[in-house]
Regions:
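Membrane-embedded helix-loop-helix hairpins and adjacent transmembrane boundary segments
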Residues: 1-384
Length: 384
């Protein structure tokens, strides 16, 4: 949430001359308004519109860049320059840590899961995931090519702010700039909305176990989910104002999920032996190890660590990247060890089956009000 708010804050500051902090408040207020009003429905429909804007803007920017400057890739930065993945001198540990954190750590993201769980059927969810993967790869490649070209031809650097914003402000035609900026805002709003909605829903439903009450004048689950959004946006806004680095905040979020939850989540899909003890121990150890490493690191993913750093002589910049991979390995090892020492108990399994059955009944009740979806009732809930 904070990482996406930073992008909006910088955008409003540079192009609308709105102070950074006020820009964040305005952005989060707009996202919160439509998220509270429509929940997953508004999140899904606005997401579809926002995706269309982003795709059109990306293609337009790529075409303009190619026609104006050509596509220029600096030496050593091309797709076949594998030194970036094999040589520590070229940042291989950091690059691998980024790929693993974003590629595996993001699997645990609940704003992603809510879209999967909300799909009409498993088949629809599968097709949507593959389609989204292709579009994400294409859009990411486009912006990478544009950024590399801008750096090589125009000499733009991140020292003067986001390279994309400099390019849009000084070089790109106004109409195209507006379209691309709309795409940036759309992408940020879509992710921020999903983060707000998913986090509040999990806190209320899974942590505090609030449930819908049939026949109630005001559904307590809906009321408390909306109420939980307020503190979430306050904390996210505070972090965005204090740590104004989009890439660092986004990567840190996935980095922590990788260290705490990714291993147990993926293994738990296929391996029924682990129980609560294994999950909680692995998550606790992973979090502790990653925070300690973060405090010792002078740099974090290649930039100065201004999040949490304790000056020391034990750890140098060479440890950057390795910290992410090592924390994940330690957490996963603890999870496997605890799974063998303290397997899932019969009581835990019985409780989980009861939860699955309750979810199945709740889903059937909800789908009964939507006849066109009735054939897929129960499709998204299985014993696994």
């Amino acid at each position: 949430l904070a990482g996406n708010l930073v992008a909006c804050g910088y955008l409003l500051e540079r192009f609308a001359h709105i102070p950074y902090a006020f820009g964040i408040v305005i952005s989060v207020g707009l996202v919160l308004a439509y998220t509270i009003a429509g929940g997953l429905v508004s999140d899904a429909y606005t997401g579809a519109i926002q995706t269309a804007i982003t795709v059109v803007a990306s293609i337009g920017l790529l075409v303009w860049t190619a026609m104006t400057f050509g596509i220029v890739i600096p030496e050593g930065m091309g797709p076949f320059d594998f030194e970036q993945l094999t040589s520590a001198a070229h940042g291989a540990p950091i690059n691998w840590a980024t790929l693993v954190a974003l590629g595996i750590g993001d699997v645990v993201a609940i704003d992603f899961m809510q879209r999967v769980f909300g799909a009409r059927s498993p088949q629809v969810a599968r097709r949507a995931c593959f389609t989204a993967a292709i579009i994400t790869a294409a859009v990411g490649t486009i912006f990478a090519l544009v950024a590399l070209t801008a750096s090589a031809v125009l000499g733009l650097t991140a020292a003067d702010g986001p390279v994309l914003y400099q390019l849009l402000d000084q070089w790109v035609p106004p109409a195209l700039s507006i379209l691309v900026l709309s795409g940036v805002v759309a992408a940020s709003f879509s992710t921020a909305s999903g983060a707000i909605l998913a986090t509040s829903a999990v806190i209320v439903r899974n942590v505090f176990r609030v449930r819908s009450v049939e026949g109630a004048r005001r559904d307590p689950l809906l009321v408390w989910t909306r109420a939980a959004m307020i503190p979430i946006v306050i904390v996210g806004s505070f972090m965005a104002i204090r740590i104004s680095q989009t890439g660092v905040l986004l990567t840190l979020a996935f980095d922590l999920m990788l260290a705490c939850l990714a291993g147990p989540f993926i293994a738990g899909v296929f391996w029924m032996r682990p129980g609560r003890a294994a999950i909680l121990t692995a998550a606790g150890v992973g979090l502790g190890v990653r925070v300690v490493f973060l405090a010792l690191q002078p740099t974090f993913y290649g930039v100065e660590n201004n999040i949490l750093h304790v000056p020391n002589t034990l750890v140098t910049e060479a440890f950057d990247g390795w910290a992410t991979l090592l924390a994940f390995a330690i957490s996963m090892s603890v999870f496997v060890l605890m799974a063998w020492l303290r397997p899932r108990t019969a009581g835990e399994l019985e409780y989980e089956l009861q939860v699955v059955e309750a979810l199945r009944l709740e889903q059937e009740k909800e789908l009964a009000t939507a006849p066109e979806l009735a054939p897929t009732a129960g499709a998204g809930v299985t014993a696994n």
